[in-house]
Amino acid sequence: MPLGLKPTCSMCKTTSSSMWKKSPQGEILCHHCTGRGGGGAGVAGGTGGGGGGGGGFGTTTFATTSAGPSQSNGGGGGKQSKQEIHRRSARLRNTKYKSAPAAEKKVSTKGKGRRHIFKLKNPIKAPESVSTIVTAESIFYKGVYYQIGDVVSVIDEQDGKPYYAQIRGFIQDQYCEKSAALTWLIPTLASPRDQFDPASYIIGPEEDLPRKMEYLEFVCHAPSEYFKSRSSPFPTVPTRPEKGYIWTHVGPTPAITIKETVANHL
């Protein structure tokens, strides 16, 4: 069909339709006239039946017309029936096999079982784990008792040299993983290379992030008086009386030997 020309239904002469179709005879039909089922043939059959005279209904058609009066030729009364065909779909139900009725639920007269005691009616979701940190002044790790102020060494991965630091505090998380906050010790020109001398190191910067205890190696406990011991921890002849302070060490103390040595020197 050329563009710009409005189609016209050959039966109802309408110019507006949601869908247009073409009949096998080449006639243009609208969507309403398409569902009639052989509209053009029905009109022709009705005309021939009316011309036969006498008002016979020999060729009665069940096609419906949407608009316009019924056509009749001759002196008869050949009228087209205006009965509409409605196709109704009926459900086919097989009544031979009916579903069995649901069995009645038996009510138990016994008491509740043991499993019912442990079943919660309203289960509660476990809360998410929150990381908690516990600080301490001393910990026990791999057979060594660490305290604040102890000196530890850390091996560098690149050069493999030990670097010394002093423990500033201890941290333990929820999984019992122990860490320590360190304060680095800076060596001087008088510091030996093969061992640690507390008198030759000075306090350096403090490290913000803690380090795990598995990377730390114990060196010594906190030296007295800022890395310089004024008196020896071993039993020697005292040069002056020391009051209010006693040196001690782990293990049995030979008290008799110390007293005899001091008495002989006096």
Swiss-Prot record:
Any GO MF annotation of the entry: sequence-specific DNA binding
Zinc finger regions, GATA-type: 9-33
Swiss-Prot/TrEMBL keywords: Isopeptide bond, Metal-binding, Nucleus, Ubl conjugation, Zinc, Zinc-finger
Gene Ontology, cellular component aspect: nucleoplasm; nucleus
Cross-link (Glycyl lysine isopeptide (Lys-Gly) (interchain with G-Cter in SUMO2)): 259
Presence of keyword Protein biosynthesis: no
Gene3D superfamilies: Erythroid Transcription Factor GATA-1, subunit A (3.30.50.10)
Subcellular location: Nucleus
InterPro entries listed in its UniProt record: GATAD1, Znf_GATA, Znf_NHR/GATA
Subunit-level organization: Component of a chromatin complex, at least composed of KDM5A, GATAD1 and EMSY.
Protein's name in the database: GATA zinc finger domain-containing protein 1
